[in-house]
């Protein structure tokens, strides 16, 4: 039964989502920092308000953390962070940039050939590593490359964003939403790939055709490129040994996760030991090179700034740029991102801090403490560059946001909203499998934009389908799960940056590099690929279900 508490819970949930999409920073008295209400803080504040209003209780909070209905949030986050650490440390070795240079050489001076090769490369890398590491390295590389080659950056960057997010639907570890679906619908991890591989292939091909259609003008993708010099792919492979070890460990972890899923074993029990082993290797290997005075990451970096600076220098020198002020700017905005402040700006948390002025004695003490902390950080970064470069790149903002979303949606369920939404789903589809595919798929794409990233949309729709499951056939439930998998991944290629964490990350990196992509521009160039992929992807899901059932 819907009560006043139910209405209040829904209203607070919607308001919190509004602040996720459009974050604000509330001014306060001068000596107190401004209060940001955004992706990290808005859901937590909503939980606090609902708890104070007695709209939820500790049992609901516990259910949002431990999990209900087979969905285990801690399982999802441990798995995602474990694999993210391995993927990011692999990226730090320079293997992604090396692959980009190799592909660039293969493309030569043919503009469309190079555009196609980059699309294929980014797609394959995103399948294996997930979209976040590819967005991190691929975006920075394309910014530099398009500047050097004097190309229109928007066509290349939008292609990269679409390729990375579309490819993340293949493996269950490609996106946190995939793990939510596997957990929530009890889909075997290997079966997940079997179901999504055909929709992915169709979406990827038609997405490229849509991109090619809207960028057919030579001002976006020229027929011939002015820059034809070969790039040295080996020069940016900063740690060949680390690349080999990291590739082997990541591949082994993924294969074992797929295998153990057949035996009902939680996959985080596999991924976490691999991540710990990779951490031990990183620390030991960095220590060995430090003691033996071997080049760290292949270029002898000595601190947080050194690593990023050198990586850009290698990129720009290999690309043979001659603009000195560009070099200076690139050094300052280097990748890997070395500090947590930069990561905060990437996620666009809008933390505007007004420093209060302490008394002189206190100021001296604070300055001394800060100086020691900076010196210690530089020393540790010089000793263990792999870990201290990877640490700020881990998606820590995902932790409070994901848990908060689970708790808020658990609160909606506690107040009876999931039963209401489930009833609406049944009335709209009458339990028909094909209607369910299209309704869940289209709703999934829309909700990615208006429900606080694709993670929130996936959690919400998973709960709705489960609420309606007693009146749905097993085939319809499975079809809804696959439709949601397709929608939650292509939904990131959408109208708002906040449709996914990858979108916020992508916008932040571009902002750092001095490229401003407006919300309108982002929506305009994504509209055609999104519509095409939605129609094609859901049509393939319907065809799959027709053949299987």
Where are these regions (language model features)?
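Hydrophobic transmembrane alpha-helices of multi-pass small-molecule transporters
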Residues: 1-92, 199-200, 212-423, 517, ...
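Cytoplasmic-side transmembrane-helix entry/capping segments in multi-pass membrane proteins
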Residues: 33-45, 101-105, 111-117, 121, ...
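Membrane-embedded alpha-helical segments and adjacent helix-loop junctions characteristic
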Residues: 58-152, 384-388, 392, 396-478
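Hydrophobic residues within alpha-helical transmembrane segments
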Residues: 117, 121, 159-162, 197-198, ...
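The feature identifies polytopic integral membrane transport proteins across all domains of life
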Residues: 132, 153-161, 165, 180, ...
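Re-entrant/interfacial helical elements at transmembrane boundaries that shape
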Residues: 133-144, 157, 171-185, 420-424, ...
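Transmembrane-helix bundle segments that line or gate the permeation/cavity pathway
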Residues: 150, 154, 160, 171, ...
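C-terminal transmembrane helix pair
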Residues: 194-200, 400, 404-407, 432-549
């Amino acid at each position: 039964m819907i009560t006043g508490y139910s209405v209040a819970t829904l209203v607070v949930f919607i308001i919190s989502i509004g602040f996720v999409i459009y974050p604000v920073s509330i001014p306060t008295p001068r000596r107190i920092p401004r209060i940001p209400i955004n992706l990290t803080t808005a859901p937590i504040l909503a939980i606090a308000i609902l708890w104070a209003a007695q709209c939820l209780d500790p049992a609901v909070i516990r259910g949002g953390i431990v999990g209900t209905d087979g969905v285990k949030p801690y399982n999802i986050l441990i798995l995602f962070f474990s694999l993210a650490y391995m993927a990011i440390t692999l990226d730090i070795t320079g293997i992604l940039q090396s692959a980009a240079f190799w592909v660039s050489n293969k493309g030569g001076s043919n503009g469309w050939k190079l555009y196609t090769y980059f699309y294929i490369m980014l797609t394959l890398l995103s399948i294996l590593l997930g979209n976040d590491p590819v967005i991190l390295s691929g975006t920075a590389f394309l910014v530099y490359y398009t500047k050097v080659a004097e190309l229109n950056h928007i066509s290349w960057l939008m292609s990269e964003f679409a390729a990375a997010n579309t490819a993340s639907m293949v493996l269950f570890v490609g996106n946190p939403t995939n793990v939510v679906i596997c957990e929530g619908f009890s889909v075997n991890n290997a079966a997940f790939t079997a179901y999504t591989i055909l929709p992915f292939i169709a979406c990827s091909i038609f997405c490229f055709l849509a991109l090619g259609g809207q960028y057919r003008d030579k001002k976006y993708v020229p027929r011939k490129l002015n820059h034809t010099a070969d790039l040295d792919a080996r020069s940016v492979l900063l740690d060949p040994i680390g690349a080999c070890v990291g590739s082997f460990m990541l591949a082994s972890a993924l294969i074992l996760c797929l295998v153990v899923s057949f035996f009902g074993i939680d996959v985080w029990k596999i991924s976490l030991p691999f991540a710990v082993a990779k951490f031990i290797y990183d620390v030991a290997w960095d220590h060995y090179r430090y003691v033996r005075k071997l080049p760290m990451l292949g270029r002898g970096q000595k601190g947080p700034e050194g690593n990023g600076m050198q990586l850009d220098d290698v990129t720009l020198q290999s690309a043979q740029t001659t603009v000195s002020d560009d070099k200076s700017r690139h050094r300052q905005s280097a990748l890997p991102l070395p500090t947590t402040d930069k990561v905060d700006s990437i996620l666009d948390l809008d933390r505007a801090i007004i420093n209060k002025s302490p008394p002189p004695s206190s100021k001296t003490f604070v300055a001394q403490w800060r100086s020691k902390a900076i010196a210690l950080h530089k020393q540790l970064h010089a000793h263990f560059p792999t870990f201290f470069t990877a640490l700020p790149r881990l998606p820590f903002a995902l932790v409070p946001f994901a848990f908060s979303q689970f708790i808020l949606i658990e609160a909606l369920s506690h107040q009876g909203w999931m039963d209401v939404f489930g009833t609406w789903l049944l009335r709209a589809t009458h339990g028909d499998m094909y209607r369910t595919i299209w309704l869940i798929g289209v709703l999934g794409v829309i909700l990615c934009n208006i429900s606080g990233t694709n993670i929130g949309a996936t959690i919400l729709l998973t709960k709705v389908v489960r609420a309606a499951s007693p009146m749905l056939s097993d085939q319809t439930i499975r079809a809804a799960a696959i439709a949601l998998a397709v929608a939650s991944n292509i939904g990131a290629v959408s109208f708002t940056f906040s449709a996914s964490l990858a979108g916020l990350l992508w916008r932040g990196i571009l902002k750092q590099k001095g490229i401003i992509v407006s919300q309108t521009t982002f929506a305009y160039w994504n509209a055609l690929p999104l519509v095409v992929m939605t129609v094609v992807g859901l049509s393939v899901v319907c065809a799959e279900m027709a053949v299987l059932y």
